[in-house]
Curated annotation (Swiss-Prot):
HAMAP family, sorted: PdxT
Hydrolase in keyword set: yes
GO terms under biological process: glutamine catabolic process; pyridoxal phosphate biosynthetic process; pyridoxine metabolic process
Self-association state and partner proteins as the record states: In the presence of PdxS, forms a dodecamer of heterodimers. Only shows activity in the heterodimer.
One GO molecular-function entry: pyridoxal 5'-phosphate synthase (glutamine hydrolysing) activity
PROSITE patterns the UniProt entry points to: PDXT_SNO_1 (PS01236), PDXT_SNO_2 (PS51130)
Cited function: Catalyzes the hydrolysis of glutamine to glutamate and ammonia as part of the biosynthesis of pyridoxal 5'-phosphate. The resulting ammonia molecule is channeled to the active site of PdxS.
Protein name as annotated: Pyridoxal 5'-phosphate synthase subunit PdxT
Family per similarity comment: Belongs to the glutaminase PdxT/SNO family.
Amino acid sequence: MTAPVIGVLALQGDVREHTAALAAAGADARPVRRPKELETVDGLVIPGGESTTISRLVDLFELREPIDKRIADGMPVYGSCAGMIMLASEVLDGRSDQRGFAGIEMTVRRNAFGRQIASFEAPVSMAGIDGDPLHVLFIRAPWVERVGRGVEVLGTVAEGPAAGRIVAVRQGNLLATSFHPELTDDRRLHAYFADLVRAAI
């Protein structure tokens, strides 16, 4: 089986952790900081961090147009936490100068969990991932308040004060989660994305 080449946007966030998780899931993972590096990958991960900072750095490194074009051409992209915000068509509580890629028709609320219950761990059952629920970390995370037509809800918080909140979605080749799977030893979500990329090659 051919290993898909998956880039990790290496401007901020858990780049090393995502790279290691993708490699463990059978992908050829590499950092992406320049348009030329983006040209070499079959899929892209946008890691967590601070979404307004990522937005500025994407412009500074001249990656906005190339990423927009690759998304339009069908390249699979996975965004975690701030990466989810970068993929959303609408962001609540964001900054006015903040710009994402608007690939997924959804409304997300920035730092939604942060104001109420800060960082926490929770089980999330995800459609398409077999076995026990994923036990994942939320770090001042967003949640999804609305999804458009064609957006599949993959996971919600199972229990606690945020029970029922949407935290994982997919639209076509675009995947987004509120949480950080790279900070656990469970590689099933990265394997799911690697399979998505493999199918798109």
